């Protein structure tokens, strides 16, 4: 068949292990090809993997996510892409059991976005989809013939299931829309630049440190290994000679038991295998064997060139010469890693071409990424802000995102659940924030009475979850801005109603009437032990959105009867931007996060009548009467906001702020 010659190639995931070797090879060997690489720089990606290509005129790097349809469409059109080599994926099987939705998002949804962009632009002449041998499922131990390309797909874990699902989409777009697709399924790959979550680099780094090599189970599992440069050559052959609509296995019939791999690495380091190999608990999802038929690709002229001994020696030499390539990876070297540690540097030593990224920063994107253009004077840039926000579906969390958009601050919402430490670690590794905002938690719907009958759920979110996030942030040197509550106090003899004497930050909570307040007081006390937390005591939050049912104005304007009692309150339109400024100033400790002074519930409703609805009427009842229609008592108090006022002298009193931010903009003429 005729050889295919591309012009402009988009390689996704090209800062990762295999794709970086492919990109570097094509850039080096084909100077007439323009290579655009797209990578979101996940934990197992590293821009240094592309160092050999960074000065090449036919190379361009773009930081971004394949799940962003706007970005992908923009790249295809503006770069004139005619060929896509799609490597980007979550690939570590172990992680897929703890966070399979992330694998679905990256591996299936991300692939779907690419395919749809190809369909819409109508300019793609080749779409090479990179899959895995694991889609075939486990091979019988006594099988003499490997899985050929027409074999049934029987994935056994969430990772391989998402790769098989992505393949189905690729095949469907090929048949339904005539997209010129080719799929590859590869054996295990090893060599330089690989993140040490995989067996060979993990064992090499452990051996370099003189530590034992942990083997899951009895070590009889069999794998086939190919050296990275041989695999890069295989993709070069598939690119130029592969036939549209076909699948190609990239494999070898040479198999090795995990035991033998460990022994060979011990031999390279002159270590006694008997003393330095330790058998640990097996993984329940550790398939015994993957075996491929490799004849189809060989007919195109490819064959592996690097022997096992030669490849292993090259790999060992590279890791011993580059021990800090990935930074602190001690967490990945554990026998059963709970979650990987933060990898090392992400940037080239010199400046990067951010021209395209800077252009894209002006366009809407799903990742809220703002990439500043490079300075021309060569002075080092102050690290830009990037917030990780928990509580996306909540009122405060949603408002924080809008403020960040307005101020041009990069941010992402956390995907993990607060009580799931591993998912929080993955968020931090993925987002790499400068600050973390926590507005997540349980307040109860429609009100805090819900917490009285859902106590374990309330503890899980408000106590265990908040403490877990604080601890993870502390481990990573991150300031956590924690939105707490001032509903942990009630008027008492030292702070009588109407006295103007408010509760200070150092005062001990005295309100235990509701289970919600108990959990918030408990977690606030425990958070005092964390020096990386800024606790913001919010009370009866109010905003300019008078249609929001969580707005205190909206709440009481819909009540049949209202208790008339003065309280401290928080006007979010004024105070949420202040919380962002507090993060910039790295303020810590406890802060009464309310406007100075108090306002009674009747005064709020009087303003509502005067500004919004002249016909509005309401009735009052006593605390005793209120107690008959609610499950748990409510907190009423005055907070002393002098500490916040001293830090932000422009802070308005509660009544001034209500008029400026809530009632004034909504005034009915």
Curated annotation (Swiss-Prot):
Required co-factors: NAD(+); NADP(+)
Enzyme Commission code: 4.2.1.76, 1.1.1.-, 5.1.3.-
GO biological-process terms attached to the record: auxin export across the plasma membrane; cell differentiation; cell wall organization; flavonol biosynthetic process; regulation of cell population proliferation; UDP-rhamnose biosynthetic process
Positions that bind NAD(+): 13-19
Residues binding substrate, per UniProt: 132
Residues where NADP(+) binds: 391-397
Reaction catalysed by this enzyme: UDP-alpha-D-glucose = UDP-4-dehydro-6-deoxy-alpha-D-glucose + H2O
Disruption-associated phenotype: Hyponastic growth, aberrant pavement cell and stomatal morphology in cotyledons, and defective trichome formation.
Tissues where this protein is expressed: Expressed in roots, stems, leaves, seedlings, inflorescence tips, and siliques. Detected in the adaxial side of cotyledons, in the emerging leaves and in trichomes. Also detected in the root tip, more precisely in the epidermal cells in the meristematic and elongation zone.
Cellular component terms (Gene Ontology): cytosol; mitochondrion; plasmodesma
InterPro entries found in the cross-reference section: dTDP_Gluc_deHydtase, NAD(P)-bd_dom, NAD(P)-bd_dom_sf, RmlD-like-bd
Subcellular location: Cytoplasm, Cytosol
Keywords, comma-separated and alphabetical: Cell wall biogenesis/degradation, Cytoplasm, Isomerase, Lyase, Multifunctional enzyme, NAD, NADP, Oxidoreductase
Molecular function terms from GO: dTDP-glucose 4,6-dehydratase activity; isomerase activity; oxidoreductase activity; UDP-glucose 4,6-dehydratase activity; UDP-L-rhamnose synthase activity
Active site: 133-134, 159
Pathway: Carbohydrate biosynthesis
Miscellaneous: The increased accumulation of auxin in rol1-2 seedlings appears to be caused by a flavonol-induced modification of auxin transport. In bacteria, TDP-L-rhamnose is formed by the successive action of three different enzymes on TDP-D-glucose. In plants, on the other hand, a single polypeptide probably catalyzes all three reactions that lead to the conversion of UDP-D-glucose to UDP-L-rhamnose.
UniProt function note: Trifunctional enzyme involved in UDP-beta-L-rhamnose biosynthesis, a precursor of the primary cell wall components rhamnogalacturonan I (RG-I) and rhamnogalacturonan II (RG-II). Plays a major role in supplying UDP-rhamnose for flavonol biosynthesis. Catalyzes the dehydration of UDP-glucose to form UDP-4-dehydro-6-deoxy-D-glucose followed by the epimerization of the C3' and C5' positions of UDP-4-dehydro-6-deoxy-D-glucose to form UDP-4-keto-beta-L-rhamnose and the reduction of UDP-4-keto-beta-L-rhamnose to yield UDP-beta-L-rhamnose.
NCBIfam families, per database record: dTDP_gluc_dehyt (TIGR01181)
Family: In the N-terminal section; belongs to the NAD(P)-dependent epimerase/dehydratase family. dTDP-glucose dehydratase subfamily. In the C-terminal section; belongs to the dTDP-4-dehydrorhamnose reductase family.
Record note on domains: The dehydratase activity is contained in the N-terminal region while the epimerase and reductase activities are in the C-terminal region.
Name of the protein described by the UniProt record: Trifunctional UDP-glucose 4,6-dehydratase/UDP-4-keto-6-deoxy-D-glucose 3,5-epimerase/UDP-4-keto-L-rhamnose-reductase RHM1
Source organism per UniProt: Arabidopsis thaliana
């Amino acid at each position: 068949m005729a050889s295919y010659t591309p012009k402009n190639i988009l390689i996704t995931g090209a800062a990762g292990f295999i794709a970086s070797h492919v990109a570097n090879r094509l850039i080096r060997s084909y100077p007439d090809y323009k290579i655009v690489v797209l990578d979101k720089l996940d934990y197992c990606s590293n821009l240094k993997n592309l160092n050999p290509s960074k000065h090449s005129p036919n190379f361009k790097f773009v930081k971004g996510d394949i799940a962003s349809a706007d970005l992908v469409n923009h790249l295809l059109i503006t770069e004139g892409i005619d060929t896509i080599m799609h490597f980007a994926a979550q690939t570590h099987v172990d992680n897929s059991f703890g966070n399979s939705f992330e694998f679905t998002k990256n591996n299936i949804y991300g692939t779907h976005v690419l395919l749809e962009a190809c369909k819409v632009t109508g300019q793609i002449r080749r779409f090479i989809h990179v899959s895995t041998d694991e889609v075939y499922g486990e091979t019988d131990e006594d099988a003499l013939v490997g899985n050929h390309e027409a074999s049934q797909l029987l994935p056994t874990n969430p990772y391989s299931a998402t790769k098989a699902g992505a393949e189905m989409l690729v095949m469907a777009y090929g048949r339904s829309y005539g997209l010129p697709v080719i799929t590859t399924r590869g054996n295990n790959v090893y060599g330089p630049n690989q993140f040490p979550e995989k067996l060979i680099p993990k064992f090499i780094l452990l051996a370099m440190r003189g530590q034992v090599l942990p083997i899951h189970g009895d070590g009889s599992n069999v794998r086939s290994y190919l050296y990275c440069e041989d695999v890069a050559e295989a993709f070069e052959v598939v690119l130029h000679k592969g036939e549209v609509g076909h699948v190609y296995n990239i494999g070898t019939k040479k198999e090795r038991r995990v035991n033998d791999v460990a022994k060979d690495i011990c031999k390279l380091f002159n270590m006694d295998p008997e003393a330095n190999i330790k058998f640990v608990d097996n993984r329940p999802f550790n398939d015994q064997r993957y075996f491929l038929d490799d004849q189809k690709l060989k007919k195109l002229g490819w064959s592996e060139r690097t022997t096992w001994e030669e490849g292993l020696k090259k790999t060992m030499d590279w890791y011993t010469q580059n021990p800090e390539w990935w930074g602190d990876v001690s967490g990945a070297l554990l026998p059963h890693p709970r979650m990987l540690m933060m990898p090392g540097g992400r940037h080239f030593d010199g400046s990067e071409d951010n021209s395209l990224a800077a252009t894209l920063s002006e366009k809407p994107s799903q990742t809220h990424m703002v990439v500043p253009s490079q300075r021309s004077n060569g002075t080092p840039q102050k690290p830009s802000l990037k917030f990780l926000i928990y509580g996306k579906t909540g009122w405060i969390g949603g408002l924080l995102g809008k403020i960040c958009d307005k101020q041009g601050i990069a941010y992402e919402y956390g995907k993990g659940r607060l009580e799931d430490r591993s998912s929080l670690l993955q968020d931090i590794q993925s987002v790499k924030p400068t600050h973390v905002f926590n507005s997540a938690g349980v307040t109860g719907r429609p009100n805090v009475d819900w917490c009285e009958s859902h106590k374990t759920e309330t503890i899980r979110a408000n106590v265990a979850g908040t403490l877990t996030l604080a601890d993870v942030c502390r481990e990573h040197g991150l300031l956590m801005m924690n939105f707490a509550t001032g509903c942990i106090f009630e008027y008492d003899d030292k702070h009588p109603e109407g006295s103007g004497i408010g509760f200070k930050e150092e005062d001990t909570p005295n309100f235990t009437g509701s289970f919600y307040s108990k959990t918030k007081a408990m977690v606030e006390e425990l958070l005092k032990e964390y020096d990386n937390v800024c606790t913001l005591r919010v009370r009866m939050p109010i905003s300019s959105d008078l249609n929001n049912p969580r707005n205190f104005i909206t709440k009481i304007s819909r009540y049949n009867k209202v208790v008339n009692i003065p309280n401290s309150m928080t006007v979010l339109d004024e105070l949420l931007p202040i919380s962002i400024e507090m993060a910039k100033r790295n303020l810590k400790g406890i802060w009464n996060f309310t406007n100075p002074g108090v306002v009674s519930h009747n005064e709020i409703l009087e303003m509502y009548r005067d500004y919004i609805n002249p016909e509005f009427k309401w009735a009052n009842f006593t605390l005793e009467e209120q107690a008959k229609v609610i499950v748990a008592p409510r907190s009423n108090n005055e907070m002393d906001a002098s500490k916040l006022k001293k830090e932000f002298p422009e802070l308005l009193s509660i009544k001034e702020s209500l008029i400026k931010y809530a009632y004034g903009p909504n005034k009915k003429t």
